[in-house]
């Protein structure tokens, strides 16, 4: 065995061994196509929130087409071995939602035990001068077009009952009119960092999903104080990237009403 940088490699007859299950000491792992020894969670693309898992008990290549309890949580893996970051087709609501303000991510769980993560949502919370209050609240469906400050309108408003002064909602990035073609691009690009007057902003698709599936659900909002550099590990399902703009860039690219 030889360590180069942060990775271990196995040499046989002065040649780096690749694509093989190996055991280094008491730890099972896998030597990838470059010979790097990996075990447990392995990031394939941090930007796209793609990770795989190598079973340290067997060292066999990535788990595929299965589910597995790992560190007290149940994860699902697709045919290519990637962690499934949305299993809402398997688990219905009501849900338990948790907003980590430090990392700009909302994780949806089946219940308050937080043992089964269901979905990850990229969010913007309040700026330091207009913070989103910590606490545990109940969600109630509000309006398809939610009137907000300005005036402005966000899509698919869900009220966070009891948070702030009674006007804190989960909603899409707001525009100055009730039109899907009135997106302020600069505000959309802030998703994932504090940007609001206290509301919880998401992309349109996620706001719609919460609106349709989380009425009556519990939400816990907190500051973890632990900023995580890797997108893939901002919560148990990581944090998805922003969808890129299409066309004129004046609409949310996740909006199902825009062809």
PLM-predicted stretches and their roles:
Residues 1-94, 150:
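Extracellular adhesion/carbohydrate-binding repeat motifs centered on closely spaced tryptophans
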Residues 9, 29, 52, 75, ...:
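Short beta-strand segments
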Residues 25, 48, 99-105, 153-154, ...:
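A short, compositionally biased
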Residues 46-49, 112-116, 164-166:
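Short, solvent-exposed loop/turn segments that connect beta-strands within catalytic domains
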Residues 81-145, 155-156, 252, 257-259:
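Cell wall/extracellular polymer interaction/catalysis modules
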Residues 27-28, 71-74, 125-136, 179-182:
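Short, surface-exposed linear segments at secondary-structure transitions and domain or protein termini
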Residues 131-134, 143-259:
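Exported/periplasmic cell-wall-interacting domains
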Residues 15, 35, 58, 67, ...:
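A mature extracytoplasmic/lumenal domain signature
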């Amino acid at each position: 065995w030889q360590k180069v940088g942060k990775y271990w490699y196995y040499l046989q007859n002065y040649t780096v061994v690749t694509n093989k299950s190996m055991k280094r000491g008491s730890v099972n792992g896998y030597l990838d196509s470059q010979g790097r020894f990996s075990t447990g969670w392995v990031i394939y693309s941090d930007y796209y929130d793609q990770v795989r898992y190598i079973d340290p008990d067997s060292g066999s290549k990535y788990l595929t087409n299965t589910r597995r309890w790992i560190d007290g949580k149940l994860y699902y893996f697709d045919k290519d071995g990637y962690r499934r970051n949305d299993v809402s087709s398997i688990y219905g609501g009501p849900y338990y939602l948790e907003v980590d303000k430090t990392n700009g991510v909302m994780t949806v769980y089946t219940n308050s035990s937080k043992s089964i993560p269901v979905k990850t949502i990229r969010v913007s919370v309040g700026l330091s001068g207009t913070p989103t209050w910590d606490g545990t609240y109940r969600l109630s469906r509000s309006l398809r077009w939610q009137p907000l400050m300005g005036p402005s309108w966000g899509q698919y408003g869900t009220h966070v009952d009891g948070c702030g002064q009674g006007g804190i909602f989960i909603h899409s990035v707001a525009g100055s009119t009730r039109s899907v073609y009135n997106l302020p691009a600069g505000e959309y690009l802030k998703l994932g960092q504090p940007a609001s007057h206290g509301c919880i902003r998401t992309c349109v698709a996620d706001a719609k999903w919460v609106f349709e599936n989380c009425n009556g659900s519990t939400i816990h909002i907190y500051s973890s104080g632990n900023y995580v550099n890797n997108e893939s590990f901002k919560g148990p399902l990581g944090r998805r990237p922003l969808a890129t703009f299409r066309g004129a860039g004046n609409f949310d690219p996740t909006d199902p009403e825009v062809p």
